[in-house]
Amino acid sequence: MNIQVLLSDKVSQALIAAGAPADCEAQVRQSAKAQFGDYQANGVMSVAKKLGMPPRQLAEKVVQLLDLGDVASKVEIAGPGFINIFLNSQWVAQQADRVLSAPKLDIAPVKQQTIVIDYSAPNVAKEMHVGHLRSTIIGDAAARTQEFLGHKVIRANHVGDWGTQFGMLIAYLEKMQNENASDMGLSDLEQFYREAKKHYDEDADFAERARAYVVKLQGGDQYCLKMWRKLVDITMAQNQLTYNRLNVTLTEDDVMGESLYNAMLPGIVADLKAKGLAVESEGATVVFLDEYKNKDGEPMGVIIQKKDGGYLYTTTDIACAKYRYETLGADRVLYYIDSRQHQHLMQAWTIVRKAGYIPDSLSLEHHMFGMMLGKDGKPFKTRSGGTVKLSDLLDEAVDRAGKLIAEKNPDMPAEEMQSLANAVGIGAVKYADLSKSRTTDYIFDWDNMLAFEGNTAPYMQYAYTRVASVFKRAGVDESNLTLPLVMTEEREITLATRLLQFEEVITTVAREGTPHVMCSYLYDLAGLFSGFYEHCQILNADSEEARQSRLKLSLLTAKTLKVGLDTLGIETVERM
């Protein structure tokens, strides 16, 4: 059920009948204020300008031609030519009844696309830290949302599993005569990494040996490949524990690291040269892009192969985009990578398109995001100024949530309390991020994110349990609610109308990669239910018809909250 699409089609038909061109836009939006109706069509203004007509005159003609049947109770013209549409409460009740019994909240079937979603992308031989959080959870929310709508989603975890660091690690492991890397945990690898880097910086012979190992690794040396694979496997096994804990849907099968594209790189460089896109410049192979200028106003050079024959991230990203089209069959590729990488990605994609590796129809989208900041407005760090490990952050979240729950429910069984602390603590961290516009930086604040008031996970989880409990207390099964939904109270109508707008919200989230829009909708929905709950008797309604209708509204609210939170990867709970 998408009311906005329905009304847009109807208003567009009326505009065309009134003389507007066939490609006119109705510009139907949800009204900002109740006095302007439920929806407002603003397209008359721009169409009137094209037709050379006074906007209000065109609006009057459109309203005369507008056939909304029983959808609207009133249509009126406001201001210079805005069309305000007031929905018919009986029609709203009928649609809510239908949505309640339909699968997937009656979301319209989509024309299925293959959507590749690039997210998380931690580095091998390093523990995940807070810098990986936003990509991981925003990308996962996108994957869940697209799948719910019916698209084929391919998750791509573009892990950093190649490069100079592996030469250092292999050389250091050999130096320590410890080739049994499978016995190491990731914390050991972090220490190894630091020691290897120290040797690399301070010992010229060691650095030379490390560089030699990189060349051997790139050349397919079996010993180096075996050691490299151990390092990758240890890291990804540890990362999988973090993904599971975060309720993130990534698995080891989704790993598509930088190394996947190695075999493609020589051919791509040769092909770009053959097409005249890449040239030799000071020993390196460079693509000069007119679309980007350097500080002297000249075309910017993008290096795709260094003097020593090594490749760069850009080369890998060119291969990556090509692979995602040719091998994965992508129609759309979403990159959840921070905003600092924007120019780099744009340059790689410009080269990809110039080379003809992908068609114009393939949408490459950088869904960039800002940084997570501390209360001081600086990048979130430990008290000593170090990087915060993701595992430590989640431990603290669960611990803080556990203490809050224990204060409110001291008699709760320990096992249930731990399970609830996990759901609330992890949910709080995720929701605090997802509820902010991804394009901006946000302040990480424990007190705000764990509050039981406001747009937070604990509040939303509590709201769900409250709604679900109404239905449980009624002691009836959904199949027993056989009477039609009838609404007489304003709060019932407002809640039902907002419930019917779920499809508008989720399609916006899917199109723009904006999970905060879903969070805002769910928070608004929870607030509307709270008002309905407080002012409308449900279980003690004055008639069986009203009782069943209000139970249906409660059930539809619970279903909608659960589906919405599921698309965000936020766990719902039965008791708070």
From Swiss-Prot:
One of its GO terms (molecular function) is ATP binding. It is found in: Cytoplasm. One of its GO terms (biological process) is arginyl-tRNA aminoacylation. One of its GO terms (cellular component) is cytoplasm. Its EC number is 6.1.1.19. A motif ('HIGH' region) lies at residues 122-132. SMART domains: Arg_tRNA_synt_N, DALR_1. It comes from the Bacteria. Belongs to the class-I aminoacyl-tRNA synthetase family. Monomer. This is Arginine--tRNA ligase.
